[in-house]
Amino acid sequence: MTPVTLPPSGHAAWDDLASWWLSRYKPSTQRTYATYLPRWNRWCAGRGIDPLAARRADVELWLHTVSDSGLSRASIAAHYDAVASIYRLAYEEELVVGNPCARVTRPKIHRELQRREVLTVLEYAAFLTTARSLSPTHHAIAVLGGMMGLRATEMATLTVESFGTVRGYATLIVVGKGDKPARVPVPIPALGAVQAAIDDRTAGPLLRTRSGAGMDRRSVHRYVAGTARAAGITRPIGPHALRRTVGTVGLNQGIPLRDVQRLLRHARPETTLGSHDITGEALERHASHRVAGFLAGWTG
């Protein structure tokens, strides 16, 4: 895989730090952070500021500039997180006297108002039916993401050897965030699709493209997007929408939060709550429906 590089900032010490900082992350995270940090670098360059000499006031003024650019709150927070991360490293390595982000208030995200792409039950049924008709790989991705909640990278890195049986349960060994391995059960409704993707092989990538090559994260995204379009879903759908669907359906069906958290392998329950369709559930279950129905009954 081609290494991710950052455009030079004009300050060699900062560029060396940035390259080292970026190398500490997985390639997918590197690509994301490589789109965030240059915005800070350009802002500093436009004001003749050496990033290693930046102050808290500079970071706060930059955040105001980013906020005025039309980006979403989540994107602004992500930009800040990248900048705050590199300054934590700079401070730990004594490259700066003080961390300019230490007392900066992180941009708030009002998660209850965020729009998250989640499939309805009927949409997922159409997605699954369409995937089954397209190819074994499409079908496997539909169940791995939409029934088991696997991330795109986790699906792409699955191997035939990761499939096995423990105490009578079919399982997959998944390598998650932070390269943490986890053994997850394959539910019976998903088992046939996984076995069809394996196709009696004993080794190699579990998911394959039409050419027979292994898949990467972007391939999984393309397959999910293509399946959604073929199923008549007009809005953009990616693998994480399938993962959110798992969490949303689980919580809406009354499965305990702890169990859904374990299914999604979240470190904190707040992440599980924040990843499902809060807005949709809140609207559907809002108490005003029952109150209004009761009161309307008295009007005849």
Predicted regions and their residues:
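Active-site/catalytic core of tyrosine-dependent DNA strand-transfer enzymes
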Residues: 187-234
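DNA breakage-rejoining catalytic core of tyrosine-based enzymes
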Residues: 96-98, 110-126, 179-188, 201-203, ...
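N-terminal core-binding DNA-recognition domain of tyrosine recombinases/integrases
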Residues: 15-31, 37-115, 130
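Conserved tyrosine-mediated DNA breakage-rejoining catalytic core shared by Y-recombinases
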Residues: 148, 153, 157-193
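Basic, Lys/Arg- and aromatic-enriched nucleic-acid-binding interface segment
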Residues: 112, 121-152, 169, 178
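Catalytic-site neighborhood detector that most strongly recognizes the C-terminal catalytic loop/helix
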Residues: 118, 178, 264-289
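C-terminal secondary-structure termini that scaffold catalytic or DNA-interacting sites
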Residues: 1-6, 290-300
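C-terminal catalytic core of tyrosine-transesterase DNA break-rejoin enzymes
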Residues: 143, 147, 243-267
